[in-house]
Amino acid sequence: MNFDLTKQQIELREKVRDFAEREVRPVASYNDENEVFDVELTRKMADLGLLGICVPKEYGGQELDTLSYIIAVEELSRVDGSTAATIAADNSLGISPIKEYGTKEQKEKYLPRLCKSHLWGF
């Protein structure tokens, strides 16, 4: 078996690492110390495609695999565990049950909104 990352996974890792250093690191300590949930940062993660990372494109997601999702969480965790937990919770607790078990109508109604940060599932 080949356990190397794909080119797409490597590019995602670099993109999320850059985002974490540029956007998350400067505010992480302040947000943590002041108990701030950074709405704007969460919207930026949605714009980057990190909410709904494994959701099919027809519902507004990135349609990436589970390893890509894990890579994104890991890269955010390097800088701030709370920020990583935000996308982990949204993808796993909010989005995944609808993606896996929702009716077509539920998927059409909720998944695009969850992927674009118009609705949160955490």
Predicted regions and their residues:
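Glycine-rich flavin
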Residues: R25-F122
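Intrinsic disorder at enzyme termini
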Residues: M1-E11
